[in-house]
Structure formats: structure tokens, C-alpha cells
Amino acid sequence: MSNAPATTSNAPVTIYSTPVCPYCVRAKQLLTRKGVAYDDIDLSSQPPAARAELMARTKQRTVPQIFVKGTFVGGFDQLYALEQRGELDKMLAG
């Protein structure tokens, strides 16, 4: 993703979000409760080309867009489902 905003930290989770998105807030709350470090990239402060490239890469037009260890998992509903099935911890450990 040449134009998409990137992160240089070692956080296992990256969330592409906007400040007014309730699902973005819920995803961050879930990760915070679990003690999982994450990078939060605010798409509202990024150039339109960055958002367009991210949307093209993931085929999703909504936020949040969540990556765990570089793997796109989807939005909040998918993150929550992974947590409920016990799969999120496995992804984070792997």
C-alpha cells in the first residue's frame, strides 16, 4: 500500500478508523480491555488517496478496518466474533 498510511510501531493490531465511528470506539475498547496494544490510524486526517487505496486493498468501504499481525480481519463485528470464539488470542500469540 504505497499511499495508505502505515505504522512503524510493533503493535500487533492496526485499526484504521475515524473519530466519530461508534464501531471504531467499540473495537478500541475491546482491545484496551484485553490489554492489547494497537495503532490507531485516523483516516479522516489522511489524504483521500490513502483511504481509497486501503478500501481497494480490503474491498471494504466502512470503518473500522482492523489488521491483526498484518492480516486483515474485517471490522468490529469480525473482531468481536474472533474474540468470542477464542481465536483472537491465538492470532495475537501466533
PLM feature spans:
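Local sequence-structure signature of Cys/Sec-based thiol-disulfide redox active-site neighborhoods
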Residues: S2-I41
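Residue-level signal for short amphipathic helical patches enriched in basic/charged
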Residues: Y16-P22, R61, L79, E83
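Short alpha-helical
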Residues: P22, A49, G74
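Non-catalytic interaction surface on structured domains
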Residues: K28, K34-G35, L54-R57, A81, ...
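Thioredoxin-like thiol-disulfide oxidoreductase module
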Residues: L43-R61, K90-G94
